[in-house]
Amino acid sequence: MKFRGQGTTMETVQRQLLKNLSLKIAGVFFVAGLAGAVLTMAPPVYGALANVQISGYVFDLTGSPLSQAMVSVKPGANHQGADAVTVFTDAEGNFRFPASVGGLANPEQQISTRVLGYEQTRVTTASMGDAQKLTVIMRKTTNVANTAPASAWLANFNAADKESLIMNCVACHQVPAPEVRAYAKQIADVTSSDPEQVRKAGWTAIVKYMNYLLADRFGPEGSSPPPDANSAYAVGDTDVVTNILAHNFTGPLQVLDHYDYGAPLAVTPNTVIMEYEVPLPNTIREAVLVGSPRKLWAADVSSNRMFSIDIVTGKQEIHEVPTNGPMGPHSLLRGADGSIWITALFATSVLAHLDADGKTWHTWPLKTQKGDRVLIHDLSFGRQHELLTDKKGRIWFSDIGNSAVGYIDPKTGIVENFKAPEVAGRSGKASLYGLVMTSDRKHIWYSQVGNGIFGSFNVETLKFEKSVVLPSATSGPRRLTISDQDIMYVPLYGAGQLIEYDTRADKQLGIYDLPDRGSVPYSVTWDPKR
């Protein structure tokens, strides 16, 4: 097919679009350079401006205060501690950074403020002794494209298209992230008598590229042969997804007139977010805070590495998980003793445990007595979100590779798994994913993200018991949590909903729409204090 005024084939258009694509897309989509944690403690400060306390106000051009403004700062090059700190304004527009930030040499460059529907125009500073007072001025904008979340662009999708796109793409990156929107603009800029075909060609090219890049970045170091762009993990049905993209993203995606969060942000003026940058290359996707003094442990899924980060000083150390092959530390779970349990992404199939001292490792190969490999996603935990064994001391897990539940006896190394029953009309990759254990330590509940099912298994009788089939196969039940009363909460990743389920009564108590049905709830955690 030829394009009017272009004299190029469809394949040439695909190659040119990919050539123009910024290489930054790989870093943003697949390399999480920042491992973040929400903290409330204030570490000590170092440097010439160490004793300076930073606070301030956020106003619009009329002088009206802006509440729940997200104010972020990047300390200077010689700082110690977090590489970025974020706080939020109160109802009067006031904000205050923890003392650990210290003074700022160039606030105009170091301060970044985010408010839906506004853009930062100016930051002024007034220094008074050991205090630095900032005034941030924001200007209202009619285009909220740069401040609204990616989910804002999904508001007009029908439910089926939205769920399908989320289930296929958003596990790896937001859609449409800024880089995706930039790519959409490149597609829209192609002059053609058949723009729909251009869109299909462009989105087909990028979906294949994403599949290849994901497999390349998440594949174990030194793996061969190179991943196949047509069959790598991620988008299972390229045609379906590219048709959804081509049908719904018809323009350059540079202008968005309106978005509403639908609810207040889940923050207060006392909320502090601290982020720590880990040197590239890495593929960090999960971290856990343990130990005394507290350290943030982050898993690099593209290697066998764990990073430990001192949250006070920012000092980092690299720890290699002692295995004979590629592991890819994936899911992390605290033990009640302050230790860390680590599951593997790759088919090496090992379970690792790091003692509370942060030095002593234990690993177990994961093969059943029949010789079958297992691929753990989640380990059993209860209301404390800490490892919870059954009464025999067995650790239960979700086996995403075999759509099964199973256990390992850490004393003997014996591993056994039990494949979840198939459900009529729900064929395809079930992907048994999340896992929680009830307080009686007799039952585990699991989710199957790939086919819209969650259910229970009796760890004493070794039998599956309850199976709850959700109306939509792409609703996406994912990482579960459970309360002290054995009330389970199931996030529906694809549908943007939350299920409340009484595991003792085997009864669903409710299903709740999130304020933004495209916000993609991946995981939930029980918080007894709030």
What are the residue ranges of the model-derived segments?
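Conserved beta-strand positions in repeat-built beta-propeller and related beta-rich domains
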Residues: W297-S302, I342-A347, D390, I395-G401, ...
